[in-house]
C-alpha cells in the first residue's frame, strides 16, 4: 500500500490557431516556438539589478526579425536575444518562482509561451538528468491530456528505496480574452492517482466558480476536467485564483487542495482614448525650436505591459500650414508637443489647430487601433513691436490760466495684441517743459496720448512751448528688439492771451489804528495790479462787503477813507479786527475782476464807562448776617478796565448813612448795612464805579436791594420775601382789574348755560321721544318687495287735467299703477276758514293743541299714498257724490283727539261767518 498520494494536473497547451482547430494534417518543416516548454534556472535568495538569469531560445522561422518578448512579472524582462534579467533588486520570498515568457511576432501576430522556473539554492536532479521542457506546437486536443508531475526524490533506507510524497506547484493557466468558443472550453484536467482505488469527486472554489462572477469556470466532478464557460474580458478581470478539491464519495478529503492561477491573456480590443477631445495650449511668438507647448494624453484599457496597451502619438495635420507645414512635433511616447521650426509670429498666425493621433500596438498603423484629438495652440503675444508715432510733429493751442485742458492728441501704431501690456502705450515728456505744466495721459480705448495742462500757463511769461515726447509700452521690449526712431515726436503748444482779472498784491492787507477816528480819515490805499501788460485797460474799485458800512473807497486809485466812526466794541468786530472786501474790475472784453480783503485792527481807547453788577440783590435786616458782593463790567480791554473803584455818593445822605462799601480787590467789593436794622423793603442804592483808563471814566449805577427778615441761616423767609417785594399801587390795580374780568367771564358763562338748559327743557316738553319723527323716514306703503315699475311720471298722477289721453284709450289690460278710467268721486268742499289775523293766535292755537296731546309731533308731516291698482273686492261702492248728507257726517272725528284735529276740520265743516 502506498504511503503517499498524488494529484495530477493535465494542462492544455495553447498553441497556434491550427492546434486550436484540431488541424494535424499540415506540419511545416520549420515550426515556430520556443526550444523548450519549461526553463529552469537556479538563483540566489537576493537577485541583483541587471543580473542575467537565463536565456530562452525562440525561432519564428523568419530570422526572429521584430520578435518581442514579454513576461507576466514587472521584476523581470527579456532582451531581444532572449536573455532574461532582473529589472531591479529582487528578494526571493519562496524557494521557487514560476514565470510565463511570451514571444510575439508583430508580422504574423503569433504568440508563443514558455514557463520559466527559478529555484533558490538547490540543484534539481531527476535520475541524474536535467528536466527537459516541452516544446510548444500544434497537438491534438485528444492528446492534450497528459500527466504533469514534478520530480520526486528517492532516499536510501534500510528497506531500500522509498518514494516520498511530492509538493505540487501548478504553473499559471493562460486563457485568451474574447475567445469565440465553442463553450464550455476545456482548460485542464485534475486527477488524483487514488482514482484507481476509490471513486473521487472533484470541485473548484473561488472567484469565478462559486463566488461572483459565478460559474465562469466549471469542473467535471468525475473526470476532473475544468472548463471555461464564456468569453473572458481582461479589462473586467485580469486573473482568477481558484482552489481544486478532491474528496471521496463520503465527502472526505482525499488530497490537499491545490491552487490554480488563471490569467486572462490580453487581446487588442480597446482603442486608445484621449482624456480630452480638445486640448488648449499656448506658446510665445518667436519661440525657438524645441520649446515645450503642451502634453496630450491617451489611455488604452488593454494591458500596458504588452503592445496592445502601448500607445504612440503622431501629428496628422496642422492648420494653417504657415510659415511651415511642420511647425510642431510630438513625442511619440509621452505626447509632449514642442516647436520644431522657427517663425511663430502672432501678427501673422494667431492660432494653430493640430490633429493628434494615438495608436496602440506601439504605433503600428497596420495592426493597431487609433483615435484622434484636437490640440489648439494659441500663439501668445510678446512685445516684439515697439509703438511708433503716426507723425513726427504735433501741435496744439491752449488759453492761459486754464487747467485740465487737452491740448493735443498723439496717435501711435502698435501691431502687438490690443489692450495688453505689450500694446498699452506710456507717454513721457523728455524735454521742453521744465516747470511741469503738461502731462500726457493714455486713452485706454484708443491708446492715444492726450497732452493735458496740469499747471496753468501765463501768456505774459511763455507764449509757446516746444515739447519732445517719447512713447513706450507697459511691458519691456522682447529680447533683441530695439526702440524705433519713430517712437519720438515733437509737440508745439501755442498759448493764447485772455483777459486776466486784476489782483491785489497784498491780499488780506492788515492795518492798525485807534478806534474812534473821525469820519473822512484816510486809512490806506488798497490798489490792484492788472496782469495783462499787453492790454490797455483801466481798473475800477468798489466795495463788495462792508458789514458796518464804515468805509469808502476811491473808484480810481483805491484810497480808503472812513464813512463813520470805527467802534471796537461793535458786534461787527471779531478779535479786535474789522474785515471789508473790495472789488477791482477792468474794462476788458469780457471784463474781469478780482477781490481783496482789508483787515483793520482797532486799538482800544477808554470810551466805555464800567457798569455795576449785579443789578439786583437781597440782604437781611440785620447787618451781621450777610453782605452783597458787587463787581463791574467794562466793554473796553486792558488797560482801560480794572482795577475799579466802588464808592457811595454823598447825596442823598441816607445812602452813606444806611450802607457801606468794603473793597475786596481791584475787581470786587462788598455792600453791607451800616445801621443795625433796616425795615424790610426794596431800596435803590446808587454806587459810583470808576475804571483805570486814561483818562478814567466813571458811572453811577443803581442796584435794587431787597431787605428781608432772615432765618438763623441767613436766608430770607417767605413772608419776608413777599413783604420785601413791595408791590406798587399800579401793580395792585392791575391785579384787581384782572380778577374782576375773570369773575365777569365766569358769570356770563353761567348765565349762558342756564338759558341753554331752559331752552332744551322747553323743547323736551313739546316732543315725545317715542313720537319724535324728525329726521326719520316713515314708510306706510311697504307691502312687500316694493314697486316693480319705478320709472313713471309723478306729475301726471298729481294733475288729473292732463289725463285726457288716458280717458280716450280703448278698454283692455292696464297696468296696476295706472289711474282708473272714469269719473272720480266728488267730495264736498269744506268752507274756507279765514286765516287768523294775528300770527301769534295761530301759534298759540298750535301750542294749546300740543299741550293737550304731549305725544303729538311738533309739526305736520305730509304722507303720500300711491295708487295701488283698480277694482275692489267689494261688490259695489257708492259714489261719494251720490251719498246722502247723513253719510257726510264726520263729527265723530272730533272725538279722536288733537292729533286728528286737521282731519276733522277738513271734513267736519265749520261755522259760517
Curated annotation (Swiss-Prot):
Topology with respect to the bilayer: Single-pass type I membrane protein
Major place of residence: membrane
Cytoplasmic side: 754-913
Range of residues in the leader sequence: 1-19
UniProt-recorded Gene Ontology molecular function terms: beta-catenin binding; cadherin binding; calcium ion binding
Coiled-coil annotated residue ranges, if any: none
Carbohydrate-modified residues: 280, 409, 554, 629, 658, 699
One matching Pfam family: Cadherin_pro
Recorded superkingdom: Eukaryota
Segments in the Extracellular topological domain: 167-731
Tissue-level expression: Embryonic brain and neuronal retina.
Transmembrane segments: 732-753
Gene3D superfamilies associated with the record: Cadherins, TCF3-CBD (Catenin binding domain)
Compartment(s) where it occurs, according to its Swiss-Prot or TrEMBL record: Cell membrane
Keyword match Repressor: no
GO annotation, cellular component aspect: adherens junction; catenin complex
Annotated SMART domains: CA, Cadherin_pro
Family matches, as InterPro entries: Cadherin, Cadherin-like_dom, Cadherin-like_sf, Cadherin_CS, Cadherin_pro_dom, Cadherin_Y-type_LIR, Catenin-bd_sf
Gene Ontology biological-process entries: adherens junction organization; calcium-dependent cell-cell adhesion via plasma membrane cell adhesion molecules; cell migration; cell morphogenesis; cell-cell adhesion mediated by cadherin; cell-cell junction assembly; homophilic cell adhesion via plasma membrane adhesion molecules
Positions of the propeptide segment: 20-166
Keywords from the UniProt entry: Calcium, Cell adhesion, Cell membrane, Cleavage on pair of basic residues, Glycoprotein, Membrane, Metal-binding, Repeat, Signal, Transmembrane, Transmembrane helix
Cadherin domain boundaries: 167-274, 275-389, 390-504, 505-610, 611-721
Protein role: Cadherins are calcium-dependent cell adhesion proteins. They preferentially interact with themselves in a homophilic manner in connecting cells; cadherins may thus contribute to the sorting of heterogeneous cell types. May play an important role in retinal development.
Entry remark concerning the domains of this protein: Three calcium ions are usually bound at the interface of each cadherin domain and rigidify the connections, imparting a strong curvature to the full-length ectodomain.
PANTHER family named in the record: CADHERIN-23 (PTHR24027), CADHERIN-4 (PTHR24027:SF81)
Protein name: Cadherin-4
Source organism of this protein record: Gallus gallus (Chicken)
